[in-house]
Amino acid sequence: MNVNVSNTAPIQYKRYVRNDFSKIHQMTAYLAMFPPNLPYFFIKHYSKINDIVFDPFSGRGTTAFEACRMGRIGIGNDLNPLAFCLTKSKVNMPKEKNIYKRLQTLKQNYQKISIENISEDITMLYDETLTLPQLFYLKHSLNKANKIDNFILAALTGIMHGKHRKNGTSMYCSIDMPNTFSMSPNYIKNFIKMHSLTKIKQDVFELLEQRIEWLFRERNKPFENLVNYRKGECFCLDAIKCSKKIMKKYGKNSVQLIVTSPPYLKNIHYGKYNWIRLWLLNEEVKNVDKTVSIYHKTQSIKGLKDNLPFESYASYMQNLFNSWYNILKPKSYAFVVIGDIGTQNLAKDTWQFIQENGGCKLNLINILEDLI
């Protein structure tokens, strides 16, 4: 296994400007994501066209999409239904013209649906004469199993909420609020009262059309074009189970490269901070936060004073790394981005734990520190 091959790798990937990459990467903001120039560097130097590139914790699909864009078979996996929706939309992209065609059909068939039974947590965010009825219609009309509908849903998650411009207009559907994550309903409710926030009447179909146009807009930069794009795949499984799935579908030792960032040791509530987007996807917040964890049994333990959370994390990572032994090709690489917690060097501590508790089938080449 390779966490970093050369001492210059952290510097080299930063030569590529993150804003020069395809806007598809920016479809929806996502917590704890790394920039596209990072996987681009590793994909460029440690794989070739038609190779399989895998990310078992794909998040919004940065590694998997960049691999597909570069002519590789990008495979993503994530238990978070929002992450699954986003990654799937990027590794199995429909044609732009087909997206517009579907939007036109949805617009023509639009009929206002009663919003009487929608929770106040949602109604406080949106205009109730046009915006919320349209959102509710799309929520019930779009089928996540259909790749065109899934892409539209993914794009819509990116404009569900966000900031307003100084002139009072917005590219988002909601009141003036952050875009990256959602504060709690009670916090938002009090914030609305405190700042006298008002809802703006937004045509969701128009916003979606503008968003789609922006996502596919190219500026003739090499990191944006989709000329070499090829279809990939996405799973919604536990990461270790996904290794077995890949071996079954693609064969033993079929993966050339892994670039991933496991969930932080300090638990991030992906459901809680995305409750508005999960409402759109018909997903329950509690179920997401219960499922999206690599150490379920330590959810109730807060802080890092007790060793149990770390040991559970490190033990899981050991089993995960060993599962990669069967899917990685000989002389292939796995780059693992691990975020430190406070003063703890999590990467080094995890590897030391693994070595002291049975070892790993993969070889560690290097551990380098870098600020992303």
What are these model-predicted stretches?
Residues 34-38, 42-111, 199-244, 257-287, ...:
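Conserved S-adenosyl-L-methionine
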Residues 82-145, 283-300:
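Conserved phosphoryl-transfer catalytic core
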Residues 135-260, 265-268:
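SAM-dependent nucleic-acid methyltransferase catalytic core
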Residues 245-257, 263-330:
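SAM-dependent methyltransferase catalytic-core segment centered on the flexible catalytic loop
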